[in-house]
Protein backbone atom coordinates (compact mmCIF):
# COMPACT_ATOMS: atom_id res chain seq x y z
CA UNK A 1 0.00 0.00 0.00
CA UNK A 2 1.34 3.42 -0.98
CA UNK A 3 1.18 5.85 1.95
CA UNK A 4 3.17 8.56 0.15
CA UNK A 5 1.80 12.10 0.18
CA UNK A 6 3.07 15.29 -1.41
CA UNK A 7 3.13 18.81 0.01
CA UNK A 8 4.30 21.60 -2.29
CA UNK A 9 6.46 19.24 -4.31
CA UNK A 10 8.01 17.60 -1.24
CA UNK A 11 7.23 13.90 -1.10
CA UNK A 12 6.72 12.32 2.32
CA UNK A 13 6.96 8.53 2.45
CA UNK A 14 3.95 8.53 4.76
CA UNK A 15 1.54 11.19 6.09
CA UNK A 16 2.47 10.97 9.79
CA UNK A 17 4.53 13.93 11.01
CA UNK A 18 5.96 14.48 14.49
CA UNK A 19 4.34 17.70 15.73
CA UNK A 20 6.39 20.61 16.99
CA UNK A 21 6.91 20.66 20.74
CA UNK A 22 6.39 17.26 22.29
CA UNK A 23 9.02 15.60 20.10
CA UNK A 24 11.77 18.07 20.93
CA UNK A 25 14.56 17.52 18.41
CA UNK A 26 14.05 13.77 18.43
CA UNK A 27 17.01 12.74 20.58
CA UNK A 28 15.03 11.24 23.45
CA UNK A 29 12.67 9.38 21.11
CA UNK A 30 15.53 8.02 19.01
CA UNK A 31 16.44 5.84 22.00
CA UNK A 32 12.97 4.28 21.92
CA UNK A 33 12.03 4.06 18.24
CA UNK A 34 13.51 4.52 14.79
CA UNK A 35 12.43 8.10 14.13
CA UNK A 36 12.79 7.44 10.41
CA UNK A 37 9.31 5.91 10.77
CA UNK A 38 7.90 9.44 10.51
CA UNK A 39 7.14 10.95 7.13
CA UNK A 40 8.61 14.15 8.53
CA UNK A 41 9.73 15.62 11.83
CA UNK A 42 8.68 19.11 12.80
CA UNK A 43 11.18 20.57 15.25
CA UNK A 44 10.25 22.22 18.48
CA UNK A 45 9.86 25.98 18.12
CA UNK A 46 13.05 27.79 17.12
CA UNK A 47 13.78 31.46 17.84
CA UNK A 48 16.69 33.69 16.85
CA UNK A 49 18.13 33.72 20.36
CA UNK A 50 18.14 31.11 23.11
CA UNK A 51 15.07 31.12 25.37
CA UNK A 52 14.77 29.58 28.82
CA UNK A 53 10.98 29.56 28.57
CA UNK A 54 8.35 30.23 31.19
CA UNK A 55 8.74 29.53 34.94
CA UNK A 56 7.58 26.23 36.45
CA UNK A 57 5.03 24.75 36.73
CA UNK A 58 4.36 24.97 33.02
CA UNK A 59 2.65 21.65 32.34
CA UNK A 60 -0.37 20.01 33.93
CA UNK A 61 -2.59 17.08 33.10
CA UNK A 62 -6.35 17.57 32.80
CA UNK A 63 -9.24 15.39 31.65
CA UNK A 64 -8.41 14.10 28.16
CA UNK A 65 -5.45 16.36 27.66
CA UNK A 66 -2.51 18.46 28.80
CA UNK A 67 -2.19 22.20 29.38
CA UNK A 68 1.25 23.62 28.69
CA UNK A 69 2.88 27.01 28.88
CA UNK A 70 6.49 26.14 28.05
CA UNK A 71 7.18 29.51 26.48
CA UNK A 72 9.28 28.42 23.51
CA UNK A 73 12.25 27.10 25.45
CA UNK A 74 14.93 26.37 22.85
CA UNK A 75 18.67 26.80 22.26
CA UNK A 76 18.30 29.41 19.50
CA UNK A 77 18.77 29.01 15.76
CA UNK A 78 22.58 28.94 15.75
CA UNK A 79 22.75 26.12 18.29
CA UNK A 80 19.98 24.29 16.43
CA UNK A 81 21.99 24.38 13.19
CA UNK A 82 25.24 23.33 14.84
CA UNK A 83 24.02 20.77 17.38
CA UNK A 84 20.57 19.45 16.45
CA UNK A 85 20.20 19.62 12.68
CA UNK A 86 23.09 17.23 11.85
CA UNK A 87 21.50 14.66 14.17
CA UNK A 88 18.08 15.01 12.54
CA UNK A 89 19.57 14.78 9.06
CA UNK A 90 21.09 11.41 9.90
CA UNK A 91 17.60 9.87 9.68
CA UNK A 92 15.59 8.97 6.59
CA UNK A 93 12.84 11.52 7.03
CA UNK A 94 12.02 15.09 6.00
CA UNK A 95 12.85 17.97 8.33
CA UNK A 96 10.42 20.82 8.99
CA UNK A 97 11.77 23.76 11.01
CA UNK A 98 9.15 25.42 13.21
CA UNK A 99 10.04 29.11 13.51
CA UNK A 100 8.82 31.71 15.99
CA UNK A 101 9.42 35.44 15.81
CA UNK A 102 8.43 38.43 17.88
CA UNK A 103 8.37 40.74 14.87
CA UNK A 104 8.00 40.40 11.12
CA UNK A 105 11.72 41.01 10.80
CA UNK A 106 12.54 38.06 13.07
CA UNK A 107 10.38 35.70 11.03
CA UNK A 108 12.13 36.89 7.88
CA UNK A 109 15.60 36.53 9.40
CA UNK A 110 14.88 32.99 10.62
CA UNK A 111 13.60 32.04 7.19
CA UNK A 112 16.72 33.41 5.49
CA UNK A 113 18.92 31.41 7.84
CA UNK A 114 17.05 28.10 7.58
CA UNK A 115 15.48 27.99 4.12
CA UNK A 116 18.38 26.19 2.43
CA UNK A 117 19.02 23.83 5.34
CA UNK A 118 15.65 22.12 5.84
CA UNK A 119 12.94 20.60 3.65
CA UNK A 120 10.15 22.92 4.79
CA UNK A 121 9.52 25.71 7.28
CA UNK A 122 6.46 25.90 9.54
CA UNK A 123 5.72 29.49 10.55
CA UNK A 124 4.15 29.49 13.99
CA UNK A 125 1.75 32.43 14.18
CA UNK A 126 -0.39 30.76 16.81
CA UNK A 127 1.59 29.98 19.94
CA UNK A 128 -0.65 30.97 22.89
CA UNK A 129 2.09 30.82 25.52
CA UNK A 130 4.20 33.87 24.77
CA UNK A 131 2.75 37.27 25.49
CA UNK A 132 4.76 39.33 23.06
CA UNK A 133 4.01 38.63 19.42
CA UNK A 134 2.68 35.22 18.44
CA UNK A 135 -0.90 35.57 19.53
CA UNK A 136 -1.29 39.04 18.04
CA UNK A 137 0.05 37.91 14.68
CA UNK A 138 -2.00 34.73 14.61
CA UNK A 139 -5.38 36.27 15.34
CA UNK A 140 -5.28 39.01 12.70
CA UNK A 141 -5.78 37.94 9.06
CA UNK A 142 -3.94 41.07 7.88
CA UNK A 143 -0.90 40.16 9.99
CA UNK A 144 -1.08 36.56 8.81
CA UNK A 145 -1.00 37.81 5.23
CA UNK A 146 1.80 40.30 5.89
CA UNK A 147 4.14 37.89 7.65
CA UNK A 148 3.42 35.01 5.28
CA UNK A 149 4.18 37.18 2.25
CA UNK A 150 7.36 38.55 3.83
CA UNK A 151 8.57 35.04 4.62
CA UNK A 152 7.66 33.71 1.17
CA UNK A 153 9.61 36.52 -0.47
CA UNK A 154 12.88 35.21 1.01
CA UNK A 155 12.15 31.47 1.11
CA UNK A 156 13.54 28.85 -1.25
CA UNK A 157 11.72 25.98 0.48
CA UNK A 158 7.96 25.43 0.96
CA UNK A 159 6.29 27.47 3.71
CA UNK A 160 3.64 26.01 6.02
CA UNK A 161 1.64 28.49 8.10
CA UNK A 162 0.43 27.17 11.45
CA UNK A 163 -2.93 28.58 12.52
CA UNK A 164 -4.45 29.28 15.92
CA UNK A 165 -7.90 27.93 16.80
CA UNK A 166 -8.48 30.77 19.26
CA UNK A 167 -10.48 32.89 16.83
CA UNK A 168 -14.09 33.18 15.72
CA UNK A 169 -13.43 32.10 12.12
CA UNK A 170 -10.21 30.23 11.36
CA UNK A 171 -11.01 30.16 7.64
CA UNK A 172 -10.20 33.87 7.41
CA UNK A 173 -6.67 33.07 8.56
CA UNK A 174 -6.42 30.15 6.12
CA UNK A 175 -7.50 32.29 3.18
CA UNK A 176 -5.10 35.08 4.20
CA UNK A 177 -2.20 32.62 4.32
CA UNK A 178 -3.11 31.14 0.94
CA UNK A 179 -3.49 34.57 -0.67
CA UNK A 180 -0.04 35.52 0.64
CA UNK A 181 1.52 32.51 -1.05
CA UNK A 182 1.65 29.88 1.69
CA UNK A 183 2.38 26.43 0.28
CA UNK A 184 0.34 24.70 3.01
CA UNK A 185 -1.37 25.38 6.32
CA UNK A 186 -1.26 23.36 9.53
CA UNK A 187 -3.99 23.35 12.14
CA UNK A 188 -4.86 23.43 14.90
CA UNK A 189 -2.44 24.63 17.53
CA UNK A 190 -3.45 24.38 21.17
CA UNK A 191 -6.68 25.82 22.57
CA UNK A 192 -6.37 28.48 25.28
CA UNK A 193 -7.20 26.88 28.61
CA UNK A 194 -6.87 27.08 32.39
CA UNK A 195 -6.96 24.78 35.41
CA UNK A 196 -7.11 25.62 39.13
CA UNK A 197 -6.01 23.78 42.29
CA UNK A 198 -9.12 24.03 44.46
CA UNK A 199 -7.16 23.51 47.69
CA UNK A 200 -4.76 26.41 47.16
CA UNK A 201 -7.04 28.31 44.76
CA UNK A 202 -3.99 28.86 42.58
CA UNK A 203 -3.68 28.16 38.85
CA UNK A 204 -1.94 24.88 38.04
CA UNK A 205 0.14 26.78 35.48
CA UNK A 206 2.46 29.52 36.72
CA UNK A 207 1.54 31.76 33.78
CA UNK A 208 -2.15 31.18 34.75
CA UNK A 209 -3.29 30.05 31.29
CA UNK A 210 -1.77 27.77 28.69
CA UNK A 211 -2.52 25.72 25.62
CA UNK A 212 -4.70 22.61 25.79
CA UNK A 213 -3.74 19.63 23.64
CA UNK A 214 -4.81 16.01 23.51
CA UNK A 215 -8.08 14.16 22.80
CA UNK A 216 -10.20 16.96 24.29
CA UNK A 217 -9.53 19.19 21.27
CA UNK A 218 -9.88 16.63 18.47
CA UNK A 219 -13.51 17.37 17.52
CA UNK A 220 -12.65 21.08 17.34
CA UNK A 221 -9.65 20.34 15.14
CA UNK A 222 -11.58 18.06 12.78
CA UNK A 223 -14.28 20.70 12.36
CA UNK A 224 -11.73 23.43 11.60
CA UNK A 225 -9.87 21.26 9.07
CA UNK A 226 -13.18 20.57 7.33
CA UNK A 227 -14.08 24.28 7.26
CA UNK A 228 -10.68 25.27 5.87
CA UNK A 229 -10.74 22.49 3.27
CA UNK A 230 -13.85 24.09 1.80
CA UNK A 231 -12.14 27.49 1.55
CA UNK A 232 -8.57 26.87 0.35
CA UNK A 233 -6.86 24.81 -2.34
CA UNK A 234 -3.44 24.42 -0.68
CA UNK A 235 -2.68 21.27 1.36
CA UNK A 236 -3.80 21.11 4.98
CA UNK A 237 -1.80 19.35 7.68
CA UNK A 238 -4.26 18.37 10.39
CA UNK A 239 -3.49 17.97 14.07
CA UNK A 240 -5.10 18.10 17.47
CA UNK A 241 -5.71 15.13 19.73
CA UNK A 242 -4.78 12.35 17.31
CA UNK A 243 -4.21 9.26 19.45
CA UNK A 244 -4.72 6.39 16.99
CA UNK A 245 -5.29 5.57 13.34
CA UNK A 246 -9.05 6.14 13.59
CA UNK A 247 -8.43 9.73 14.66
CA UNK A 248 -6.02 10.18 11.76
CA UNK A 249 -8.57 8.81 9.28
CA UNK A 250 -11.12 11.39 10.48
CA UNK A 251 -8.69 14.17 9.60
CA UNK A 252 -8.06 12.77 6.12
CA UNK A 253 -11.78 12.47 5.43
CA UNK A 254 -12.27 16.05 6.66
CA UNK A 255 -9.65 17.30 4.19
CA UNK A 256 -6.15 16.90 5.62
CA UNK A 257 -3.37 15.77 3.27
CA UNK A 258 -1.12 14.80 6.19
CA UNK A 259 -1.35 14.76 9.97
CA UNK A 260 0.84 15.66 12.93
CA UNK A 261 0.90 13.78 16.23
CA UNK A 262 2.02 15.44 19.45
CA UNK A 263 0.56 14.64 22.85
CA UNK A 264 0.28 10.92 22.07
CA UNK A 265 4.09 10.76 21.81
CA UNK A 266 4.25 11.36 25.58
CA UNK A 267 2.00 8.38 26.21
CA UNK A 268 3.03 5.97 23.48
CA UNK A 269 6.34 6.59 21.67
CA UNK A 270 5.44 3.83 19.20
CA UNK A 271 2.22 5.55 18.16
CA UNK A 272 3.66 6.49 14.77
CA UNK A 273 4.11 2.82 13.85
CA UNK A 274 0.66 1.83 15.08
CA UNK A 275 -1.02 4.72 13.29
CA UNK A 276 0.74 3.93 10.01
CA UNK A 277 -0.24 0.26 10.22
CA UNK A 278 -3.83 1.19 11.04
CA UNK A 279 -4.08 3.61 8.12
CA UNK A 280 -2.73 1.00 5.73
CA UNK A 281 -5.16 -1.65 6.95
CA UNK A 282 -8.08 0.79 6.68
CA UNK A 283 -7.21 1.77 3.12
CA UNK A 284 -6.98 -1.88 2.09
CA UNK A 285 -10.24 -2.75 3.82
CA UNK A 286 -12.08 0.14 2.17
CA UNK A 287 -10.54 -0.36 -1.26
CA UNK A 288 -8.57 2.88 -1.45
CA UNK A 289 -5.31 2.78 -3.38
CA UNK A 290 -3.76 5.84 -1.76
CA UNK A 291 -4.23 8.47 0.94
CA UNK A 292 -5.07 11.02 -1.76
CA UNK A 293 -8.31 9.20 -2.58
CA UNK A 294 -9.42 9.57 1.03
CA UNK A 295 -8.67 13.28 1.46
CA UNK A 296 -11.86 15.33 1.68
CA UNK A 297 -14.04 12.31 0.93
CA UNK A 298 -16.64 13.09 3.59
CA UNK A 299 -20.21 12.10 2.75
CA UNK A 300 -22.63 14.88 3.71
Swiss-Prot record:
Pfam family membership, one: DHO_dh
Keywords of this entry: Cytoplasm, Flavoprotein, FMN, NAD, Oxidoreductase, Pyrimidine biosynthesis
Single GO BP term: 'de novo' UMP biosynthetic process
MF annotations from Gene Ontology: dihydroorotate dehydrogenase (NAD+) activity
Catalyses which reaction(s): (S)-dihydroorotate + NAD(+) = orotate + NADH + H(+)
Record bears the keyword Cytoplasm: yes
Note accompanying the cofactor annotation: Binds 1 FMN per subunit.
One GO cellular component term: cytoplasm
Annotated active site: 127
EC numbers, comma separated: 1.3.1.14
Subunit note: Heterotetramer of 2 PyrK and 2 PyrD type B subunits.
Family: Belongs to the dihydroorotate dehydrogenase family. Type 1 subfamily.
Protein name per UniProt: Dihydroorotate dehydrogenase B (NAD(+)), catalytic subunit
Organism from which the protein derives: Caldicellulosiruptor bescii (strain ATCC BAA-1888 / DSM 6725 / KCTC 15123 / Z-1320)
Amino acid sequence: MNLEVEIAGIKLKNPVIAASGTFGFGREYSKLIDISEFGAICTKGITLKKRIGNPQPRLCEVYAGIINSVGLENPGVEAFINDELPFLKSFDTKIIANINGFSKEEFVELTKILTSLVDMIEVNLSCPNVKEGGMVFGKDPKKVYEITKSVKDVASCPIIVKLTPNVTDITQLAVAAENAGADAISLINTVSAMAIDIETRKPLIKMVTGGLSGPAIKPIAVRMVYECFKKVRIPIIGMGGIMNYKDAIEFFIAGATAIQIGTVNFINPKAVCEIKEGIEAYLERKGFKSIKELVGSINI
